Structures are given as structure tokens and as C-alpha cells.
């Protein structure tokens, strides 16, 4: 009788271990598909990711590059001061989206163009995502929006 209980206990522990392993693998796979890494334009230019990889790119919308087509397709360049990457987006852009403004886009590279499926703009005049601030600081082009310039005006990300 004792041998039977011990055998049954080992079977239950083995089944629980297998179930836990399967659950861990399933959760890990689901999380991996939901994680989108952030890259700056300089990082994308230095080491272009595979076309199948979905990631976020962030920086400033380069002045003079914003082109709104007749359809809902918009093209622009995202820069961090070190490199510029062409972006194409089909859809309605956020109200605060514009040239010299911070943006983060989700999508993938196709033939040297970042095809965005989602475009985010900062939600007020002073906010900029941490990743974008870090990338701009690394390139030496970040200006604190709360700091005043030599003329007494506020610098902002665009320097105006």
C-alpha cells in the first residue's frame, strides 16, 4: 500500500512538472511575440534589422521631409542627428505630429524604408519618450524643453 502511494505521488509530481514546463514555454513564446524593441535611426543605419523584424523607431521628424500624399499615405524622415531613416505610414496621424517634433513609430524595414503600422506623437509640448531623449542625447542634439536659450526663449526638442 505504501509503495502504491509513493508511486502515485511521483506520477502527480511528474505530471505537474511537465504541465509547468509547457505553461512556461507558452508564456515565453507569447511574450516574445509581444515585445517590440526600440531602435534609434543611427542604430538602424549601422545594423539594418531583417525585414521580418517588427520594432519601434524614434527620433525627430526631420524638417522639410513631411510629405502628405493624396491618399492617407504620409512619408517623412526620422532623425536622431546622426542618421535619418525614411518612414512611410498609411493612416491618420496624431494631432501633435509635425516637423521637428518627437515621434515613435512601430513597423518594419522594407527595401530601406521603415513601413510604419502605428505612429505615436508626444502627448504635450514638453513630453518626449525616454528612448528618444536618450538617442538624441547620444547624438548630442537633445535640448531640454524646460531650459531657456540665449534669447530667453525655450529650447524644446526643435531648438525653437
UniProtKB/Swiss-Prot annotation:
Keywords: Cell inner membrane, Cell membrane, Cytochrome c-type biogenesis, Heme, Iron, Membrane, Metal-binding, Signal-anchor, Transmembrane, Transmembrane helix
Any Pfam family matching the protein: CcmE
Topology class, membrane: Single-pass type II membrane protein
Top-rank taxon, per record: Bacteria
Regions crossing the membrane: 10-30
Family matches, as SUPFAM superfamilies: Heme chaperone CcmE
BP terms from Gene Ontology: cytochrome complex assembly
InterPro entries cross-referenced by the UniProt entry: CcmE (IPR004329), CcmE-like_sf (IPR036127), NA-bd_OB-fold (IPR012340)
Molecular-function GO terms, alphabetical: heme binding; metal ion binding
Keyword presence, rRNA processing: no
Cellular compartments annotated: Cell inner membrane
Reported function: Heme chaperone required for the biogenesis of c-type cytochromes. Transiently binds heme delivered by CcmC and transfers the heme to apo-cytochromes in a process facilitated by CcmF and CcmH.
HAMAP family: CcmE (MF_01959)
Protein name as it appears in the record: Cytochrome c-type biogenesis protein CcmE
Originating species: Dinoroseobacter shibae (strain DSM 16493 / NCIMB 14021 / DFL 12)
Amino acid at each position: 500500500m505504501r509503495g502504491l502511494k509513493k508511486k502515485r505521488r511521483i506520477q502527480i509530481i511528474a505530471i505537474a512538472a511537465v504541465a509547468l514546463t509547457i505553461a512556461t514555454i507558452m508564456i515565453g513564446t507569447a511574450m516574445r511575440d509581444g515585445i517590440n524593441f526600440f531602435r534609434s535611426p543611427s542604430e538602424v543605419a549601422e545594423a539594418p534589422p531583417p525585414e521580418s523584424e517588427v520594432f519601434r523607431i524614434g527620433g525627430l521628424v526631420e524638417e522639410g521631409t513631411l510629405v502628405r500624399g493624396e491618399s492617407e499615405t504620409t512619408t517623412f524622415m526620422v532623425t536622431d542627428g546622426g542618421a535619418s531613416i525614411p518612414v512611410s505610414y498609411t493612416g491618420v496621424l496624431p494631432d501633435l505630429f509635425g516637423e521637428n517634433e518627437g515621434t515613435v513609430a512601430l513597423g518594419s524595414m522594407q527595401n530601406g524604408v521603415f513601413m510604419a503600422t502605428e505612429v505615436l506623437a508626444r502627448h504635450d509640448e514638453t513630453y518626449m519618450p525616454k528612448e528618444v531623449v536618450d538617442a538624441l542625447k547620444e547624438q548630442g542634439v537633445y535640448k531640454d524643453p524646460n531650459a531657456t536659450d540665449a534669447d530667453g526663449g525655450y529650447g524644446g526638442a526643435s531648438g525653437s
